[in-house]
Amino acid sequence: MRTTPTFPTKTFKPTAMALAVATTLSACLGGGGGGTSAPDFNAGGTGIGSNSRATTAKSAAVSYAGIKNEMCKDRSMLCAGRDDVAVTDRDAKINRPPPPNLHTGDFPNPNDAYKNLINLKPAIEAGYTGRGVEVGIVDTGESVGSISFPELYGRKEHGYNENYKNYTAYMRKEAPEDGGGKDIEASFDDEAVIETEAKPTDIRHVKEIGHIDLVSHIIGGRSVDGRPAGGIAPDATLHIMNTNDGTKNEMMVAAIRNAWVKLGERGVRIVNNSFGTTSRAGTADLFQIANSEEQYRQALLDYSGGDKTDEGIRLMQQSDYGNLSYHIRNKNMLFIFSTGNDAQAQPNTYALLPFYEKDAQKGIITVAGVDRSGEKFKREMYGEPGTEPLEYGSNHCGITAMWCLSAPYEASVRFTRTNPIQIAGTSFSAPIVTGTAALLLQKYPWMSNDNLRTTLLTTAQDIGAVGVDSKFGWGLLDAGKAMNGPASFPFGDFTADTKGTSDIAYSFRNDISGTGGLIKKGGSQLQLHGNNTYTGKTIIEGGSLVLYGNNKSDMRVETKGALIYNGAASGGSLNSDGIVYLADTDQSGANETVHIKGSLQLDGKGTLYTRLGKLLKVDGTAIIGGKLYMSARGKGAGYLNSTGRRVPFLSAAKIGQDYSFFTNIETDGGLLASLDSVEKTAGSEGDTLSYYVRRGNAARTASAAAHSAPAGLKHAVEQGGSNLENLMVELDASESSATPETVETAAADRTDMPGIRPYGATFRAAAAVQHANAADGVRIFNSLAATVYADSTAAHADMQGRRLKAVSDGLDHNGTGLRVIAQTQQDGGTWEQGGVEGKMRGSTQTVGIAAKTGENTTAAATLGMGRSTWSENSANAKTDSISLFAGIRHDAGDIGYLKGLFSYGRYKNSISRSTGADEHAEGSVNGTLMQLGALGGVNVPFAATGDLTVEGGLRYDLLKQDAFAEKGSALGWSGNSLTEGTLVGLAGLKLSQPLSDKAVLFATAGVERDLNGRDYTVTGGFTGATAATGKTGARNMPHTRLVAGLGADVEFGNGWNGLARYSYAGSKQYGNHSGRVGVGYRF
């Protein structure tokens, strides 16, 4: 037996002539018929428009002529195994306006128009290209030379020998970046592997483009050199089974059968079959086939025109169909067939297997062709001159309607050094579906053939009349919608075996209807985002199923399964021997209800995970058993006071067993929530289980947490806990603070609740801390101490001291005359204390003058502008300042000197930090810093030309800071004004050594000590409080700091001079490095 590819020509010749014929036939006729993306045969119709999705609306049942209800029995092709529904007649029509343009995507190139028709763009934009998916193509055509097409690099091609049994692989690798092209001459009998050596832009190839090349390009052709017309799945691996019998236009059945075997052996899951046996039954109405199997077999043979001998029956039904059935059942393969181009009411015979064998339906999809208005193509091709025109166009889905959909009949491909080739025929409708199936398998690699065909069929766009009918099948392929999973379960239960680990999640985002159910297997997670109305049961045997919306189905959770309700959701009855999880992953804070519209049974082996504020509402009876895990994490439970209250977590019309039947109860109170006991209450509306909860003492909790904190944070953690406890004592005393309503009503600033109105945001922020993870206690309490204010102020004061010292050093080396100098100074360092590190950075630019004001007196003054930054933990500070520095030195002959120093600066400290559990606060504070210093030095001769000076003295720092209030959080800090004075002792050595009459080197070493310490902590309270007070934390600035430096002065001549300095100040915990360069002019 021989078959032909489904080109729209009577006798296919895969040559340039055949292509030319295909491109010249542009007339299309036809009408009526339609498909649907849902399995309801009495659903209302939808139009076809821009980015529209099929929807169903109930309407009166439609009578379908020619179909008897009893024929539905055991006829999966008609009724999907159901005996209570009918199928539209193949000629059924519905009065409706003409369908609009089907373009739903927006690929701009006209050669990609067929991709817009199937809404491909969402799939491409999501990054799906078919990578990692193996696709088989059983086809024919002159294609040995075409393996040098760069668009098809990576394609694996297999020919066959004369016995149609042994295939030789021709494997093309990626095109190398260098090397020229070469023609490849090989026979299909060669036992060799061919590797091309060609660049995508330098290809010499055969003149003829075969049918096999065109089909391959539609599925997996790559876009080369910027050309837009690539295939549907350009990264898929293509296995080409060339079954050419030597005539270039026909295929041997034995070769086809063996091709399927070889693809199955290679693990190929998706197979494109753009061929078929030409129908000779004309418009024979196979809907009238009687129920008996023998009559069907005879009608099938009559329809196919096959050989009626025993050998013909063996080849047609035992060999071909038996081969298909085996691979569908045992190899999990999906076979996609074209309907053919005879403009007949029935498709080619290869796709009829499910009519004969019901279970085969899960592995076969038949594809009809549609034009851009959604109707079938009818093409006219004229034969020899003087003959009547012969009509050719897409065959209808016919009796394969339940496993049939439609795809564009026309497409465009482009090979290197060719213009775009316009092609037409169901040969190219089928690979459009095949390519989409490859994208789908890339996204859901666990999908079975049944999963794939269910998803592709049920997401099709509804075109034409309503219902799965004999023209369009399920409707027009919608690739974008298919990538969101199935839209219906019409073929029985949908088994999702999501193989993998629990950290991998897959999502179905369509609303799912149908009479089937869902069986969840495998370790990975499956998420349902739609509002689902399917009526079959949902059984979770393994992994987790997450519901983001409503689910009408009754649920059963097995021991290795988990059901997660994310957010407010509802569903049917629930029976669980596994895990039922109600805690939110996003901790949104809403008082959400999971509504079970039926009964609840928690068996002894299962576990209920829930949290305070989440209510499990059961309309029927609740039978309680197993383990309860109650968490106080999240915000839903609201603020808890020290007295406590009941928080319900389960309500039912009746709780059939006492709550004590929870065999084990575990609780997670979070940071400050204490869960005391479970209580059962009965009311007019049913029974309720509640937990009695109260808050813990923040100061004691923080003190305990400080034991495990780094030494540098202990004080801040304890201070933050004390601040929070003071605040919660105030909240406890406010009106109605213990009720859940407090959070919502106070947030709305209701005038009828004046006692709590000022605390709306404060209750929410405090509640978030109460219910936070206990492991985050150190971080949270530290943030409530706001240490960044004191620490950044201390860092700024130290840097201003470094800048004043620079003025002091300049007095020692000014020389004679008036000197003007400009300098830039860069500071940086770290402050590590008890395992906690802070970082500082600073930059200052100064201009100033220095001059001899008398025979033994030198004076200097500079103006500086600077910016410094400080970062610690999750807080950052930026300090901008402007300061005046001045100094005077008086020499007492060669013995020594006296110095007076002064600085005054204003600063603005801008703070950004996290506070509490998950809030953010920002603030700014203004202040001034004045410094006064008095120093004396004694000169000691050193070597022949050098000088050594011993210097000592005192400096007084006076810091004044304004009051401030942070914004953005009720747990931000509202600080009082601050005044702090610090006396600093100074001592050091200075060494100067001239190198010449124009260059001098300097070295310094010394010590600074705060004689009375410095305390920049800020008293105040949280911005969300009205009475509670506290103070910020602070690092302990080292009282004693070592200082050292190196430098040089150079005279350039003509009055110009320059300087360079490096200095260090620090201790074991603290270090500040400073570099300074300047240039001056001496008058």
From Swiss-Prot:
The keyword Protease applies. The active site is at 139 (charge relay system), 211 (charge relay system), 427 (charge relay system). Induction: The translocator domain alone accumulates during growth under iron-limiting conditions, cell-associated full-length protein accumulates later (at protein level). A lipid is attached at residue 28 (N-palmitoyl cysteine). Disruption phenotype: Altered processing of autotransporter proteins IgA protease and App. No longer processes extracellular LbpB. Increased biofilm formation. GO terms for molecular function: serine-type endopeptidase activity. Keywords: Autocatalytic cleavage, Cell outer membrane, Hydrolase, Lipoprotein, Membrane, Palmitate, Protease, Secreted, Serine protease, Signal, Transmembrane, Transmembrane beta strand, Virulence. The keyword Transmembrane applies. Its EC number is 3.4.21.-. Residues 111-483 form the Peptidase S8 domain. It comes from the Bacteria. Pfam families: Autotransporter, PATR, Peptidase_S8. It is an enzyme of class 3 (hydrolase). Residues 1-27 form the signal peptide. CDD domains: Peptidases_S8_Autotransporter_serine_protease_like. One of its GO terms (biological process) is protein processing. GO terms for cellular component: cell outer membrane; cell surface; extracellular region; plasma membrane. Belongs to the peptidase S8 family. Major human immunogenic protein. Autotransporter with a secreted protease domain involved in processing other autotransporter proteins including App and IgA. Probably autoprocesses to release the about 70 kDa passenger domain. Processes the lactoferrin receptor lipoprotein subunit (LbpB) extracellularly, releasing it from the cell surface. LbpB release protects bacteria against complement-mediated killing by anti-LbpB antibodies. Processes NHBA. The signal peptide, cleaved at the inner membrane, guides the autotransporter protein to the periplasmic space. Insertion of the C-terminal translocator domain in the outer membrane forms a hydrophilic pore for the translocation of the passenger domain to the bacterial cell surface, with subsequent lipid-anchoring to the cell outer membrane and eventual release of the passenger domain. The translocator domain (residues 777-1084) forms a 12-stranded beta-barrel with a 10 X 12.5 Angstrom channel with its N-terminal alpha helix (residues 786-817) inside the channel. The N-terminus of the N-terminal alpha helix points to the extracellular side. The isolated beta-barrel forms a pore able to import and export antibiotics; removal of the N-terminal alpha helix enhances transport. This is Neisserial autotransporter lipoprotein NalP. It comes from Neisseria meningitidis serogroup B / serotype 15 (strain H44/76). The gene is nalP.
